[in-house]
Amino acid sequence: MGAAPSKIVDGLLEDTNFDRDEIERLRKRFMKLDRDSSGSIDKNEFMSIPGVSSNPLAGRIMEVFDADNSGDVDFQEFITGLSIFSGRGSKDEKLRFAFKIYDIDKDGFISNGELFIVLKIMVGSNLDDEQLQQIVDRTIVENDSDGDGRLSFEEFKNAIETTEVAKSLTLQYDV
């Protein structure tokens, strides 16, 4: 993958928070990560990104970056995903990304089971399953304003609106 085709770059300029120079620098970084020169980053390559492998949600993050569900992250998906974490990414973009981490089946809702799975990944063995299920049940009950037993994006957003989630989803990196 030499210089990124201008049509792709033009689309990324329109759809992301990066300028042309930033996209070019990120393209070079992408090419270094793509060790086998396949044009995409597989799970092992994705996990080699500094700070990613130590994140318990790294697998889910990669799945959210992988918009076409191919199992790999191509250049457009890489830039689009990183754009959300840039300082220019909006709070709404960051919250939508966080929501997608929990929405494993991509149906637009966070179910009790999905919330349990993601929280289990995060807390590991620090809580037993019964304690964790109580937290999940309480979280759903307290935030499910329409009573359908699951959280929509708006319910999720309202639940964490007062937290500093958007700030914690901003990466400081040298582009």
UniProtKB/Swiss-Prot annotation:
A lipid is attached at residue 2 (N-myristoyl glycine). Keywords: Calcium, Lipoprotein, Metal-binding, Myristate, Repeat. Ca(2+) 2 binds at residues 66, 68, 70, 72, 77. One of its GO terms (biological process) is conjugation with cellular fusion. InterPro entries: EF-hand-dom_pair (IPR011992), EF_Hand_1_Ca_BS (IPR018247), EF_hand_dom (IPR002048). Ca(2+) 3 binds at residues 103, 105, 107, 114. Belongs to the calcineurin regulatory subunit family. This is Calcineurin subunit B.
